[in-house]
Amino acid sequence: MGNSVMEKIKGGLVVSCQALEDEPLHSAFIMSKMALAAVQGGAVGIRANTAKDIRAIQSEIDVPIIGIYKKDYDDSDVFITPTLKEVREICETGVEIVAMDATTRKRPHNEDLKDILSAIRKEFPNTLFMADTASIEDVYYADSLGFDLIGTTLYGYTEETANKNISDDDFSHLKEVLKSTKRPVIAEGKIDSPSKARQVLTLGCYAVVVGGAVTRPQEITTRFTNEIQKIQEERGK
């Protein structure tokens, strides 16, 4: 399955269809329709959160899905498919790719990422596993563990990388990631325009994931209202 899945997403756009519990569009049904709309628009894959959403999306579309499970634990900052329990639950949906936090941070219950990956590969040998990284150190770590794909997902979202953007310094972090691994790199995180998506693919990324810029209306609306607010502020001067 691995090679055919990789061919399907190569050079294309994966749309992240997620809405957390505190967001207006939080609904497996709504996410399934969001995914359908994304595929109709040309998306070659979908990234989705929770088994419930994934199964609803699977009923609507037939493209590869990157599955995750966002879950908070009191004893760790790691929340993207953080423990073996969540990894297994997402694998059981039959998604082609499962992504998990691959940072070097302490995991919930002191679970070890190496042990998680080793155990789950024995249970689901045909599933591909994607490492969500934040730093170059994470990339080397994930590479050494044998992840199938490397994502830049958490760059800008950890204490170490807070407020950083994938496009900073002419995509310097992404360029370093591409130099640091021979595994397929999936660009993800704060890619909020078509031009950024095109740029990361031009630099050599295998595929690109875009989320809020496509599927979070509140964020899209805010970008417009912020610009309009500037006009009002200028007139008030």
UniProtKB/Swiss-Prot annotation:
Any one GO CC term of the record: cytosol
PANTHER family to which the protein is assigned, alphabetical: N-ACETYLMANNOSAMINE-6-PHOSPHATE 2-EPIMERASE-RELATED
SUPFAM superfamilies (UniProt xref): Ribulose-phoshate binding barrel
Pathway named in the protein's UniProt entry: Amino-sugar metabolism; N-acetylneuraminate degradation; D-fructose 6-phosphate from N-acetylneuraminate: step 3/5
Top EC group: isomerase
InterPro entries attached to this UniProt entry: Aldolase_TIM, NanE, RibuloseP-bd_barrel
Alphabetically ordered keywords of this record: Carbohydrate metabolism, Isomerase
Transmembrane segments: none
One MF term in the entry's GO annotations: N-acylglucosamine-6-phosphate 2-epimerase activity
Record NCBIfam families: PRK01130.1
One GO process term, biological-process aspect: N-acetylneuraminate catabolic process
Protein role: Converts N-acetylmannosamine-6-phosphate (ManNAc-6-P) to N-acetylglucosamine-6-phosphate (GlcNAc-6-P).
UniProt organism field: Listeria monocytogenes serovar 1/2a (strain ATCC BAA-679 / EGD-e)
UniProt xrefs under CDD domains: NanE (cd04729)
Known EC number: 5.1.3.9
Gene3D superfamilies to which the protein is assigned, alphabetical: Aldolase class I
Name of this chain's protein: Putative N-acetylmannosamine-6-phosphate 2-epimerase
Family from the record: Belongs to the NanE family.
Catalytic activity reported: an N-acyl-D-glucosamine 6-phosphate = an N-acyl-D-mannosamine 6-phosphate
Pfam families given in the database record: NanE
